[in-house]
Amino acid sequence: MSKFNRIHLVVLDSVGIGAAPDADKFFNAGVADTDSDTLGHISETAGLSVPNMVKIGLGNISRPIPLKTVPTEDNPTGYVTKLEEVSLGKDTMTGHWEIMGLNITEPFDTFWNGFPEEILTKIEEFSGRKIIREANKPYSGTAVIDDFGPHQMETGELIVYTSADPVLQIAAHEDIILVEELYKICEYARSITLERPALLGRIIARPYVGEPGNFTRTANRHDYAVSPFQDTVLNKLADAGVPTYAVGKINDIFNGSGITNDMGHNKSNSHGIDTLIKTLQLPEFTKGFSFTNLVDFDANFGHRRDPEGYRDCLHEFDNRLPEIIANMKEDDLLLITADHGNDPTYAGTDHTREYIPLLAYSASFTGNGLIPQGHFADISATVAENFGVDTAMIGESFLGHLK
């Protein structure tokens, strides 16, 4: 019998809590990640008021230096710890896959200087369209269409760009390049990026509409991902008949593997929280696992090195946390964590190699305190033990610590 009938895992994308022990092996603009500290530096430079996460125990997580504006709680309502990544990567897919029980020993390839001519030329030859070379670099998805959409409308050239993650994205105005054509181009791009030196996690079709100065991305986005190389706990749950619900980009990250119910992409963190709450309210969701990713922290503020915006985004989530809890049942478990860091005060624009926080809450708790410090995959091991399925490759369950 399950200790908790439902477990809800919410990933606050990039909300790290201090440099990992191996941060010296990871870099931003030539600077090692050794001094990165997403929550610490936001708290220090912009101030941080997250009283609802404080109640659960966020300020009680062990740190060399306490979070400046996040107090400790004498009698928290939950259990907390921080977790270390063992996989050789600090990207979204690697973090999420490890959280679900896999050790990624060979990271995907990322292209901080843009894609090589060999890849671009192949796409041009296949599509019969030129590629705008100036867009070929890590770029905000909205900024890239603002900057190059007018040129695309005039020439029909492709907007090919990347990000901090191992992805190749192609943006196309739906009136200039039909969605079906864009999909075929992305399918081809997927076929040529399945092995090194260009092993990419996802190819993403990014259609948009509108006029210069007023472009809008449409719901016709399509992801061409690779599936995890081995079963994750999501697969073990699905195979055992335990429903799994994906909110946000979770379904894309796992290429649908082990997902029984995809609740759709998020338009924003707030929309994602709305979707999570609707998921919690589903009458048929009496037992199972929900997995939510809230990406605005990372996409809108971490990469853009905007600590004040990041702070406000954390405030927004914290303000809505009581709504999530109010829609949980007595025997539900809420786990709040991250997938990597992205210190908005740090050098460069890439993710940062950090510990991630873990907050555990249930209305059924009679105790509180610290969970032993462990690794990302401890989450998957805990979920697996709760539902009585086999664990994946790695991880130690902390289920027994939750009283």
Swiss-Prot record:
Subcellular location: Cytoplasm
Organism: Streptococcus pyogenes serotype M6 (strain ATCC BAA-946 / MGAS10394)
EC code(s) of this entry: 5.4.2.7
Role summary: Isomerase that catalyzes the conversion of deoxy-ribose 1-phosphate (dRib-1-P) and ribose 1-phosphate (Rib-1-P) to deoxy-ribose 5-phosphate (dRib-5-P) and ribose 5-phosphate (Rib-5-P), respectively.
A GO molecular function held by the record: manganese ion binding
NCBIfam families membership: deoB, PRK05362.1
Binding site for Mn(2+) 2: D298, H303, H351
Superkingdom of this protein's organism: Bacteria
Record GO biological process: 2-deoxyribose 1-phosphate catabolic process; 5-phosphoribose 1-diphosphate biosynthetic process; metabolic compound salvage; nucleotide metabolic process
Substrates-to-products reaction catalysed: 2-deoxy-alpha-D-ribose 1-phosphate = 2-deoxy-D-ribose 5-phosphate; alpha-D-ribose 1-phosphate = D-ribose 5-phosphate
Protein's pathway: Carbohydrate degradation; 2-deoxy-D-ribose 1-phosphate degradation; D-glyceraldehyde 3-phosphate and acetaldehyde from 2-deoxy-alpha-D-ribose 1-phosphate: step 1/2
Family from the record: Belongs to the phosphopentomutase family.
GO CC aspect terms: cytosol
Listed SUPFAM superfamilies: Alkaline phosphatase-like, DeoB insert domain-like
Free-text comment on the cofactor: Binds 2 manganese ions.
Stated name of the protein: Phosphopentomutase
Keywords: Cytoplasm, Isomerase, Manganese, Metal-binding
Residues that coordinate or bind Mn(2+) 1: D13, D339, H340
Cofactor(s) listed in the protein's UniProt record: Mn(2+)
